[in-house]
Design a protein with these regions (language model features):
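C-terminal boundary and immediately downstream tail of ABC-type ATPase nucleotide-binding domains
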Residues: 135, 232-262
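Q-loop/switch helix immediately C-terminal to the Walker
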Residues: 96, 102-116
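H-loop/switch region of ABC-family ATPase nucleotide-binding domains
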Residues: 203-204
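ABC ATPase NBD coupling module
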Residues: 63, 76-91, 108, 116, ...
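Conserved ABC ATPase signature
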Residues: 143-147, 151
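A short, surface-exposed alpha-helical micro-motif characterized by mixed small hydrophobic
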Residues: 209-211
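ABC ATPase C-loop
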Residues: 160-161
Length: 262
């Protein structure tokens, strides 16, 4: 179990006299992620969803500080411990495709991710992994500058699948993808969850979240406003704000009904 307990993230602000003060961005955030489940972290822009993922991996910018506790299987993790877990126990799929090294081919980047986790990094296996994301094996010879944004997103998702991490922290993983590719990618995440990985997925897309996630955690004004199963949201439970958001979606109208994903 990966647990965030009373996590607070604050940003440093300086007056013209150089005095520093701290402004809270996230306050008293508590949530749990179990192996085998997908939890969708939803909320508007600027709510701090990405910062919460970064805090788990000690990737916060220098002008931010974190309070509270992040634990793995009941054991609190210090900054150094969380840093050591990156890439194998905790895998991060960032929002920006700039995370790909512009000087390395796709093959070298995927191969490195596989080797760091003790996995087979043969060209054949890497090519098979790309095909699962509807990318030709020839993509292995490409550099990031030769990829579209959607292709780069799928390459980043491949790194998570290759590593076999216990917990995957995915930030806006479906950004820049059309619905067909977004559903393909989320279906692959569901397969990883079915094999035992816990997935914390940041998204703005509540409709996709309800289709693919097991639970919804909603942030509003820097705090957790809702924690509930997707089933309960469909039944009309949750805060007034979350229910209004859900009922405003085209998917809520029977004319645009979308099948549930099991």
């Amino acid at each position: 179990m990966l647990s965030f307990d009373h996590v607070t993230i604050e940003a440093a602000h300086y007056s013209w006299l150089g005095r520093r003060s701290w402004q809270p961005l996230l306050t008293d955030i508590s949530l749990q992620l179990a192996p085998g489940e997908i939890v969708a972290l939803v909320g508007g822009s600027g709510e701090g969803k990405s910062l919460l993922l970064q805090s788990a991996l000690t990737l916060l910018p220098d002008n931010l500080r974190m309070g509270g506790t992040i634990s793995l299987d009941g054991t609190p993790l210090c900054d150094a411990s969380r840093a050591r877990l990156r890439g194998h126990t905790l895998c991060y799929v960032p929002q920006g495709v700039s995370a790909l090294n512009p000087l390395l081919t796709v093959e070298r980047q995927l191969g490195r991710a596989a080797r760091l986790c003790g996995q087979n990094a043969s060209r054949e296996r890497l090519g098979e992994q790309l095909l699962r994301y509807q990318l030709p094996a020839a993509t292995l010879d490409s550099y990031p500058r030769q990829l579209s944004g959607g292709m780069a997103k799928r390459i980043l998702a491949c790194t998570a699948a290759l590593g076999g991490a216990r917990y995957i922290l995915a930030d806006e993983i479906t950004a820049w993808l059309d619905e067909e590719l977004a559903c393909l990618l989320l279906g692959q995440l569901r397969e990883l969850a079915n094999r035992g990985s816990g997935i914390l997925w940041v998204t703005h897309d509540l409709a996709l979240a309800v289709r693919f996630a097991d639970r919804i955690v909603a942030l509003h004004q820097g705090k957790v406003s809702d924690t509930l199963s997707c089933h309960h949201l469909r039944q009309g439970q949750g805060s007034e704000m979350l229910r209004a958001h859900w009922q405003a979606l085209p998917e809520f109208n029977s004319l645009f009904s979308v099948p549930e994903v099991s």
